[in-house]
């Protein structure tokens, strides 16, 4: 490297801008940002407004409110009592067998078949085939359609099954799709299909033995839906028992304890109605009974706060006015003390049911 090169390499860099120019550039940047800040706020405001609009939009109601309504009406995610092996009913109730019934692809129902107590000794050690054949033994059969939440091992349901079994009835306790260990997702149409499938399966194996659909609370809507479809097919149900029925799901839902507290929120009732319509949750007992001819027994507790007695009375009036044979419709009101789930504790329940069915089936 020669001297000239050394000189060039050692020469200093060109002088930078004066300090005054740096301050001016910095201030210009701050000024631009300050001027843009209102625009940024405006954009943020528009984004928040758009998000709020989407939250209150119909599409979001369909995606959020409808599943919420499903959850509150069916409550099938609450699978109490917990830690129960539904495949082993003998741990909860005697002379009972567990089996599964395929309704359609992806839907398998868990069912407990309890034979009459008088056949308890015969049932010891027997398999499903024996229980199935026992449906022809002449003892009347009840297909039990429970209400929302829990499953077929719920304590109040087991108490009712025991009462009926002691009274000489076969009882098929059904968990709808999505309940207990049954697969699938609950919908009104799906639950109705489940009930029809179990009823027809039972009738195909019962010979001349009568089969009764017994619905409790939500199950009353399932029972009348199924009974109406079977009536239209020319195969009326042998008998129907409705325990704590409502008129329709719209009326029932606005008095449902988990929804009742929201009734005063502006627009809630309209949104609820839209959601029920959109999701086709109707369970129209008040319309269904107008098309039935099967013997119909309505049971209701005087102190039922979940489904008030007035709904049962209203349904009875509608049914009695619609039935040609008035003797086929009866309502029994139970005194205070049994509330919504405990009519099974009434000492008169069994005799009430047996007397009604015996008279209708004689």
From Swiss-Prot:
Query: What are the record keywords, sorted?
Result: Hydrolase
Q: Name one GO cellular component term.
A: endoplasmic reticulum membrane
Q: Which InterPro entries match?
A: AB_hydrolase_fold, Hydrolase_4
| Keyword Hydrolase part of the UniProt annotation | yes
Q: What is its EC number?
A: 3.-.-.-
Q: Name one GO biological process term.
A: phosphatidylserine catabolic process
Q: Does the keyword Phosphoprotein apply?
A: no
Q: Which GO terms describe its molecular function?
A: lysophospholipase activity; monoacylglycerol lipase activity
Top-level EC class, please?
hydrolase
Outcome of altering residue 282 to V? Answer: In a breast cancer sample; somatic mutation
Q: Which Pfam family, any one, appears in the UniProt record?
A: Hydrolase_4
Q: Which family does it belong to?
A: Belongs to the serine esterase family.
Name-wise, this protein is: Protein ABHD12B
Q: Which organism is it from?
A: Homo sapiens
């Amino acid at each position: 490297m020669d001297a000239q090169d050394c000189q060039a390499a050692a020469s200093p860099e060109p002088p930078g801008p004066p300090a005054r120019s740096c301050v001016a550039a910095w201030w210009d940047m701050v000024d631009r940002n300050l001027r843009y800040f209102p625009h940024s706020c405006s954009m943020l405001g528009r984004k928040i407004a758009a998000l709020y609009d989407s939250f209150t939009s119909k599409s979001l109601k369909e995606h959020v409110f409808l599943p919420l309504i499903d959850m509150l009406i069916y409550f099938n995610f609450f699978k109490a009592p917990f830690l129960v092996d539904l495949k082993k009913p003998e741990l909860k109730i005697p002379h009972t067998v567990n089996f599964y019934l395929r309704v359609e692809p992806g839907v398998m129902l868990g069912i407990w078949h309890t034979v009459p107590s008088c056949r308890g000794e015969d049932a010891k050690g027997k398999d499903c085939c024996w229980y199935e054949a026992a449906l022809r033994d002449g003892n009347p059969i009840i297909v039990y359609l429970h209400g929302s939440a829990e499953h077929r091992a719920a304590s109040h349901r087991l108490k009712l099954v025991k009462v009926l079994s002691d009274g000489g009835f076969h009882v098929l306790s059904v968990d709808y799709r999505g309940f207990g260990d049954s697969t699938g997702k609950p919908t009104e149409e799906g639950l109705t299909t489940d009930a029809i499938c179990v009823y027809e399966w039972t009738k195909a194996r019962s010979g001349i033995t009568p089969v009764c659909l017994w619905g409790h609370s939500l199950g009353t809507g399932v029972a009348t839906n199924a009974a109406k479809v079977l009536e239209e097919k020319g195969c009326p149900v042998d008998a129907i028992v409705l325990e704590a029925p409502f008129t329709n799901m719209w009326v029932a839902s606005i008095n449902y304890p988990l929804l009742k507290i929201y009734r005063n929120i502006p627009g809630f009732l309209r949104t609820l109605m839209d959601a029920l319509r959109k999701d086709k949750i109707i369970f129209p007992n008040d319309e269904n009974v107008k098309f039935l001819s099967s013997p119909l027994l309505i049971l209701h507790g005087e102190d039922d706060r979940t489904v008030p007695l007035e709904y049962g009375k209203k349904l009875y009036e509608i049914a009695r006015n619609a039935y040609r044979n008035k003797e086929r419709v009866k309502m029994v009101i139970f005194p205070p003390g049994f509330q919504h789930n405990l009519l099974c504790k009434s000492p008169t329940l069994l005799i009430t049911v047996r007397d009604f069915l015996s008279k209708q089936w004689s």
